[in-house]
Amino acid sequence: SLVGSEMCIRDSTMGGAGGGLVYNKEELKTVCARGLQASLVGQVLVEESILGWEELELEVVRDAKGNMITVCFIENIDPVGVHTGDSFCSAPMLTISEEVQKKLQDQAYRIVDAIEVIGGTNVQFAHDPISGRVVVIEINPRTSRSSALASKATGFPIALVSAMLASGLTLDEIPCGKYGTLDKYVPDGDYIVLKFARWAFEKFKGVEDKLGTQMRAVGEVMSIGKTYKEAFQKAIRSLEKSRYGLGHVKDFDQKSKKELLTMLATPSSERYFIMYEALRKGASVEEINKLTKVKDYFIEQMKELVEEEEKLVAAYHGQVPADADLKQAKLDGFSDKYLSQILGVSEEAIRTRRTELGVVEGWEGVHVSGTEDSAYYYSSYHIKDESPVDNSKQKVMILGGGPNRIGQGIEFDYCCVH
């Protein structure tokens, strides 16, 4: 009965390998055969397509008594149709109403209670913003990629707490800082966390740079900032691809608006860099939303960055920006190196001037739940540095692998544990 309409083929594999979207009988036969071959249980699911809906996730922890808490609400900025492992994500949810979040939480609790999980579970939903309909995409009753993101975003040690719950403790028996015990925990950080995937298409000759229901990312980065713009630009710099901002990537700035919009019609690893140049060439928020189904809020934030960049280049090419404009650029996440590149002045001149103005990053702690005096820190130009440094003790530096090129993502990354 679904033949003739868009369908989604899903199999029992990690990262959606073997599945895909199909649009006719021939594609249905091909993808089903591929999915059956890849599936660990010799089955595939044939489901209606919910392409373009909002993809939303909750990380829920449950104990043996049936007590439940939500550790984190995660909004996928890319719509359904792009695998969540490839999708750009934010925590907390930035455009979803409290009413919808409460609805998702109620449904997630019913699901987790029904399967009687003890520990952490990731529940993924699709939400149609037009009709309000909600469907469950999948659940992961284990420590997943999203669990790792939720843990780092909130300071809540999901794996540790899951182990404690599995040993027989309950949430109301585990101490948790200002909340007293874990059963009273609510996510309440005053910062924004973004996850951006890292791909390596350049290492696989002949592989098309196209994103869909099969995961293509080989790693990811996570950034923390006080605003979306600040966190967004920090994420781009963390990719270790010698990109210090969103503009002037590859030859996208040489292409016409029409060419860029044609490229945006198919999701790719360069989607947000193409979007940035399309906005520079005059594409409207509505045009880009129609092609990508990325919500207006996120496109508008990017448009404001484009306008700010164009204003800086027009007014200050060959010189350091005026004090107020330089400060605003730093608040919005522009790096010294990127400002140096677009303005044609030395990076040192920009850094010297902003330091003279007192425009320097402050450091703030994300406190780890359930432990005393334990935190990790993020930098922001929106805060004053009030984190004291104790130089009386020896220190240890742990180096992680960065955004992994080939190999494990954060979900399977064991190298930082020991």
Mark where each language-model region is.
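ATP-binding N-terminal substructure of ATP-dependent carboxylate-amine bond-forming enzymes
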Residues: 1, 234, 352-355, 361-418
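Short, basic interhelical loop/turn and adjoining N-cap
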Residues: 291-300, 341-352
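ATP-dependent carboxylate activation and anion-phosphoryl transfer catalytic cores
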Residues: 1, 5, 15-17, 22-314, ...
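Extended, domain-scale alpha-helical bundle/helix-rich regions
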Residues: 329-332, 338, 342
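Short glycine-rich anion-binding loops that position phosphate/pyrophosphate groups of nucleotides
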Residues: 12-13, 142, 403-404
